[in-house]
């Protein structure tokens, strides 16, 4: 017999379902993601730290899980909410069922609830704090109290919590259907030395940089600009990550130094927001954020529309852009800023996820633009 579970939102709404993960209590900001596939990549994306993820697609878990699709070394989401967990996981790459995967990492999950109703609540009221309780003691009052006690992500610096503890080299390229994950490339195949700040970096971002000839030195979030400059990089990459960008003063100040030095800079997600803050713009907390793999974004410079992968709850405020920042991309869902480019420095950033994983690859040429800036700077 399945164990029961409940999800309680801070507004008092209660959802009862069945447990699909570990027993226990988990608290976080409840968000919804509209991706139809890629649940393992979503769960292991460090950007979901302190968030409970609701997947709007009704059937989740069909293909199981495997060690190659992880975007980090562990699950970072606080919990998982789905409509239906299939009885059987069927895929030639399957190594472990989704339920067993959650249990193995002590992550709570709940299924058999009305995820459409939950999503409508989050859209209308905004992202809410919530608490999942799974197991034998389903105490609604306790869950509600814990949801209300959660401080929320505004003002929360999570990048330094999920970052690597020590610097390391990354030389592995992208997975292919024919051969799986490749061996690390030789330095002779990687002409560009890029220092990548790990604010919660996804592995597929690193792989796509390696595919384009980058030898990566991945450094902790609080690494000083002086330490990075001592490595003599050809460019600096600012990764994705969780939480509020404003408290990341260490990263903002370091980025200011790189801008002054004229180093090529590319930022994604949190890295995009950090570049904006370092350039004098401001950021805002969004009502319910963008989380999904089907978000249309307009490229203002090429006048084309891209379908993109998105995962962010904060955004750079276009109204605060200084004269040396040019808006390059906007969301066609709500008009929010999606990309910027410094007019006076070789620096640019994108709010969405051009590496996808999961999602489309329409924005992948942004990685090529970074390489072009590095080549021009090195010439």
From Swiss-Prot:
UniProt-annotated catalytic positions: 269, 353, 355
Protein name in the entry: Carbamoyl phosphate synthase small chain
SUPFAM superfamilies linked: Carbamoyl phosphate synthetase, small subunit N-terminal domain (SSF52021), Class I glutamine amidotransferase-like (SSF52317)
Keyword Aminoacyl-tRNA synthetase part of the UniProt annotation: no
Entry keywords, A to Z: Amino-acid biosynthesis, Arginine biosynthesis, ATP-binding, Glutamine amidotransferase, Ligase, Nucleotide-binding, Pyrimidine biosynthesis
Annotated GO biological process: 'de novo' pyrimidine nucleobase biosynthetic process; 'de novo' UMP biosynthetic process; glutamine metabolic process; L-arginine biosynthetic process
Name of the coding gene: carA
The protein's annotated pathway: Amino-acid biosynthesis; L-arginine biosynthesis; carbamoyl phosphate from bicarbonate: step 1/1; Pyrimidine metabolism; UMP biosynthesis via de novo pathway; (S)-dihydroorotate from bicarbonate: step 1/3
Glutamine amidotransferase type-1 domain sequence ranges: 193-379
Family annotation (NCBIfam families): CPSaseIIsmall (TIGR01368), PRK12838.1 (NF009475)
The UniProt record lists the keyword Zinc: no
Molecular function via GO: ATP binding; carbamoyl-phosphate synthase (glutamine-hydrolyzing) activity; glutaminase activity
Organism: Vibrio parahaemolyticus serotype O3:K6 (strain RIMD 2210633)
CPSase: annotated segments: 1-189
Matching InterPro entries: Anth_synth/Amidotransfase (IPR050472), CarbamoylP_synth_ssu (IPR006274), CarbamoylP_synth_ssu_N (IPR002474), CarbP_synth_ssu_N_sf (IPR036480), Class_I_gatase-like (IPR029062), CPSase_GATase1 (IPR035686), GATASE (IPR017926)
Reactions catalysed: hydrogencarbonate + L-glutamine + 2 ATP + H2O = carbamoyl phosphate + L-glutamate + 2 ADP + phosphate + 2 H(+)
Matching Pfam families: CPSase_sm_chain, GATase
Residues the entry annotates as binding L-glutamine: 47, 241, 243, 270, 273, 311, 313-314
